[in-house]
Regions:
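Short linear interaction motifs
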Residues: 28-30, 135-154
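Structured, hydrophobic secondary-structure cores that serve as assembly/anchoring elements
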Residues: 6-7, 13-131, 153, 159-173, ...
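Generic recognition of short, well-ordered alpha-helical segments
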Residues: 146, 178-182
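Extracytoplasmic, non-cytosolic globular domains
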Residues: 184-188
Length: 527
């Protein structure tokens, strides 16, 4: 027997539609529809992003905390501006934690204030994203201490918005762990309350790379970050089927080295950077080489020069000192390391448009991505995909000759056979919302057998179309779904008195072939 998911739709019919009133004698013609009106499927891939922006102005009006529709990165830039100009501090660290090396020593780049919504939108569109909504939670100049509250306010602003099917807040990963957990739970709670959207979550802390570390170090680090993520999730089990988590972060090719200059160094790092570059000049050029002194003079002047002169001096130094180019490349890599949720939202959109919402959004290559930050293997993924507590984290992995792939298709409710898969959860939302929207004109119709038959025919036609497209399991429509509506079937006499029309729908959604097992044996030919 096929696994069937079932839900009920209840309409309140409290007034009967008035019959036409005829006064003059004569013949009147009333045309009656021979067929039930078709149900048009709702959009399945409309993301809503919340985060901080450079500006928030549309047609001269401020749109902070206002959900604003965009259709391209160009639309985003026109309304919300560009990227945040991060200022990096350069500090010596051990080699395993270094972003770059100089003179045999390791150095790390850190920035007290960072924002990632601008680059996240670019990653979303690079992976097939389409129409979406953006909510500016504030500007880059806002008090960093209020960031968590601002993101919560941005999330609240989309609660009553009709249309979005995916919640994405990449900047959640920039919060303190406790603030992150509160925002994550607020996202899941909103999804469970509205039942028309899902939350795509990132695992905080998986942005770190270990270039020279062994797999055991990576495994230990990943295990700790996953434990941090799962802590507290089980407190609201009814929300888990509306959430999907992905890890690790992604190294992208969106940010160019040319986007960085001396303006991106923190003022506290001036002496450190000057000393490093001066030593590099001494290493590259003989002591009496006139080039050496010229470069040192430029290095001295570039810090206080005005923008046009600073740009010229900076370009000259980059061309002559490979170390400086390497530092700017490290800055680009730092800013270009992004949480996976925007790319996943783009993949959902691309997958829905090309295959259908019922196809698992997995085993799909990511664009503008060079690699995941952590090299996850099969052994590491075992506990992520089938954990004892059911709190699944889908992975993004690199495969030889195949690139970086989304390698997981489960919700956080991994122990539920009914809501385990992303595609099943989203297919049910698609059916529920499409049917609910189509039945709105039925409200106030007479609650009689003719109306029940009309409603049943509408829904059956819709589900038969879904079955023909491959969205439902079963060799025949009867095996794939059923629709029930009637007195003594889904309604009692009291339901009729209370004005309720209740429809019961059962369907068998397709589930992904997650584990493909090949059984191969040798056949010995008889003598």
């Amino acid at each position: 027997m096929l696994a069937v998911s079932c839900f009920r739709v209840t309409l309140s019919l409290r007034k009967e539609q008035a019959m036409p009133e005829y006064k003059a004698p004569g013949v009147y013609i009333e045309e009656i529809g021979a067929f039930a009106p078709p149900i048009v499927g709702v959009a399945t891939a409309v993301a809503v992003f919340v985060g901080h922006t450079e500006i928030a102005s549309q047609a001269g009006h401020a749109v902070t905390l206002v959900p604003t529709r965009i259709d391209s990165p160009k639309d985003y830039s026109a309304i919300f501006g560009g990227a945040h100009a991060a200022r990096f501090k350069v500090q010596p660290v051990i080699a395993s934690e270094a972003d770059f090396t100089a003179g045999g020593a390791g150095y790390a780049l850190s920035s007290e204030t960072t924002f990632n919504l601008y680059d996240s939108i670019r990653l979303f569109y690079a992976n097939g994203g389409g129409t979406c909504y953006v909510v500016s939670a504030g500007s880059y100049a806002d008090d960093p201490a209020q960031r968590a509250a601002a993101l919560q306010a941005g999330l609240a602003a989309v609660h009553d918005l009709t249309g979005p099917t995916m919640l994405v807040i990449p900047e959640a990963t920039l919060l303190e762990l406790n603030d992150y957990r509160l925002l994550r739970q607020a996202m899941l709670t909103q999804c469970a309350d509205k039942q028309d959207r899902v939350a795509i979550l990132d695992v905080i802390g998986t942005d770190r790379s270990f270039p020279s570390a062994d797999l055991r170090t990576v495994e230990t680090y990943l295990h700790d970050r996953i434990a941090d993520f799962r802590d507290g999730l089980a407190a609201a089990p009814e929300t888990l089927k509306f959430g999907m988590a992905y890890a690790p972060f992604l190294k992208t090719s969106l940010v160019d080295v040319g986007d960085f200059s001396f303006a991106n160094f923190d003022s506290d790092s001036k002496e450190t950077v000057t000393a490093l570059l001066a030593s590099e000049i001494d290493r590259l050029y003989p002591a009496r080489d006139p080039n050496a002194q010229s470069l040192k003079n430029d290095l001295r002047d570039v810090w206080d020069a005005k923008p046009p002169t600073r740009t010229v001096l900076g370009q000259k130094l980059v061309a002559q000192i490979p170390l400086l180019s390497g530092i700017f490349a490290a800055m680009a890599a730092k800013r270009g390391t992004l949480p996976p949720s925007p790319a996943i939202a783009g993949i959902y959109t691309q997958n829905d448009n090309s295959r259908g919402v019922w196809k698992a959004p997995a085993n799909i290559g990511l664009s503008a991505v060079t690699a995941p930050t952590l090299p996850i293997n099969d052994a590491m993924q075992d506990d992520l995909n089938v954990p004892l507590d059911g709190l699944v984290v889908n992975t993004i992995r690199s495969f030889m000759n195949r690139g970086t792939l989304v390698w997981g298709a489960r919700t956080l409710d991994g122990n539920s056979s009914e809501w385990r898969y992303v595609s099943v959860r989203r297919t049910l939302i698609y059916v529920e919302q499409s049917v609910a929207l189509a039945l709105e004109p039925i409200v106030f119709e007479p609650n009689v057998a003719q109306t029940w038959a009309r409603v049943t025919a509408m829904i059956e036609n819709f589900l038969q179309g879904l079955w023909r497209q491959g969205g439902l399991m079963g060799p025949t429509p009867k095996d794939a779904f059923y629709v029930k509506c009637g007195l003594g079937v889904t309604m009692t006499a009291q339901d009729l008195l209370d004005g309720r029309l209740i429809v019961e729908i059962g369907l068998a959604p397709v589930r992904p072939a997650e584990f493909i097992v090949l059984r191969i044996g040798q056949h010995m030919q008889g003598a």
